[in-house]
Amino acid sequence: MAIIAVAELVEEVSMSRVEHVLNYLKRRQLENPGFLYAIEDDCGNVFWADPTCRLNYTYFGDTLVFDTTYRRGKRYQVPFAAFTGFNHHGQPVLFGCALILNESESSFAWLFQTWLQAMSAPPPPSITVEPDRLIQVAVSRVFSQTRLRFSQPLIFEETEEKLAHVFQAHPTFESEFINCVTETETAAEFEASWDSIVRRYYMEDNDWLQSIYNARQQWVRVFIRDTFYGELSTNEGSSILNSFFQGFVDASTTMQMLIKQYEKAIDSWREKELKADYEATNSTPVMKTPSPMEKQAASLYTRAAFIKFQEEFVETLAIPANIISDSGTHTTYRVAKFGEVHKGHTVSFDSLEVKANCSCQMFEYSGIICRHILAVFSAKNVLALPSRYLLRRWTKEAKIRGTEEQPEFSNGCQESLNLCFNSLRQEATKYVEEGAKSIQIYKVAMDALDEAAKKVAAASNRTPGTRLPNGEAYPSEEARETANATNHPGGEKERTILELTAELERTGQRCEVYRANLLSILRDMEEQKFQLSLKVQNARLSLKE
């Protein structure tokens, strides 16, 4: 990523303070060309991401959190922001960092666009940000198809500040307000509850309440639960934002301390992830029932995901599923606790596809199946979780490949053919190590290599006229040479330069095609292995019946 000239930095953040960070970024890029950083012209805003950040996004880029904790209360000395998500253990995972020295709509848009370019991947399906107009507009410009959510705990925090007099005068207001926002099950129920609170406490003309009501589609649970946000819960929990740097970067952190704290946070979370990986692989959670479905979930999910599943599964013992309509292959159930039918949920079940949908939408929101669908599965004697309800991102095999760093080549391999060679060699070494673990894996690896060799050979010998990404035809080598000779008759040296440039472009494209094909094959292998493991699990469960 090209570095743009640094302009005069704003406010109290001096060049000397930022220079400490820039020197670190330059050194990291020299050590690893896959480390990217960029500086916004005229503003001095800085962005950076290492290869692990970009690899994390390929695994867990199904939702994004833009953490701007530094903006709360203007107490922070360092305007440090982070792009984060959730890994398969529910832990925060880093996608990139930024220093935001100048806040404007265009600066946030630049930052989002730069981050997206660095990820070399599609935009996230959903994003969580603090409630702020500048950020909201920038998100709509860059992530036009991404579902925007405002941090609910942040809104609660600001509501408590702006309505402190109400909280003090009316002790019941807080619980009523939270229940209205988090516990209502339909839009109509929310509207009725909100209207009741506003009228009862004479707050019809309160500007703050009116503003957050107008934005209800972006933060009230009943309106956002149909979208995946990567949290192992139907609410946002106690954290303000998914802060990867909580406990490491705070109001006392100076620019000189930032890099040290940044690296401490990365090391800490890496260690926590490794411990969670080890626990998931080498220990078995305690079963609470003799159900084969619970055992299946324990063998596939990470510990954090399994605990959430187990909570839902155990609750099925107290919520019967009652049929309210049945058309043969499609059955509708009402699922509720004994004596609480008015708080129940509706589940539609397709017996042909073994597919169910619940009005609580917990699976859509968190990726873990809800107790209501599990109760229907129990009633229909479904003993194994269908594969559609086992999101790979919550399983022990969420990371398709074991590599932690993987350079991206957004412009093919023109920047460095040596980097291409070294990257492929590193990947091949890791592939060999995995493929030599057993005879069975070796055979699979050899078959994949044979297939890869065929695809690479086909790509290398592709016919002239290959399409470019912008839809223009890529001319044949002869045509390019003719054009070079015709359009540049001014000298042999210039013609040679153009020929070498063209050859470099072709080599870069072949390198990129080879890399893409190899990655595709490896992903296919991992997906087939995952699906096979599900089939084996289901087969074992069938034998036990």
From Swiss-Prot:
Positions of the FAR1 domain: 22-65
Domain MULE, residue spans: 66-150
GO biological process, alphabetically ordered: regulation of DNA-templated transcription
Region (Disordered): 460-495
Expression induction or repression: Up-regulated in hypocotyls by far-red light treatment.
Domain of life the protein comes from: Eukaryota
Keywords carried by this UniProt record: Coiled coil, Metal-binding, Nucleus, Zinc, Zinc-finger
Residue ranges of coiled coil: 492-545
Localization annotation: Nucleus
GO CC field: nucleus
Predominant cellular place of this UniProt entry's protein: nucleus
Tissue expression per record: Expressed in hypocotyls, rosette and cauline leaves, inflorescences stems, flowers and siliques.
ZnF start-end (SWIM-type): 345-381
Name of the molecule in the record: Protein FAR1-RELATED SEQUENCE 9
Organism: Arabidopsis thaliana (Mouse-ear cress)
